[in-house]
């Protein structure tokens, strides 16, 4: 007798998170570590829990995440996106509240590339008229 599993893939910046939701107690495991151990910043852990807060399902599902690429902020955003997509599979009625909170939209902002002749993406060396 296997439990129902719900999957979702989330992306943010260079991070990609594959998320599985299993009915349980609300335990979040990221790359086989506890979320408090893997993500040290409390504000980023709040970001991860946003989809549950919006849908009033806090503590209803255990979350297993495999995330690669990016840093803490990008990975947290990717996990949030993946959880929101997985919650859609749990109950399609969540779509309206998740969409209104902006959790289903892929944040397309990425690091702008460095241009030749400039020091960074937009920073130029100081201009001298004479």
From Swiss-Prot:
Gene3D superfamilies: 3.30.230.10. Keywords: Ribonucleoprotein, Ribosomal protein. One of its GO terms (cellular component) is cytosolic small ribosomal subunit. One of its GO terms (biological process) is translation. PROSITE patterns: RIBOSOMAL_S9. Transmembrane segments: none annotated. This is Small ribosomal subunit protein uS9. It comes from Streptococcus pneumoniae serotype 4 (strain ATCC BAA-334 / TIGR4). The lineage of its organism: Bacteria, Bacillati, Bacillota, Bacilli, Lactobacillales.
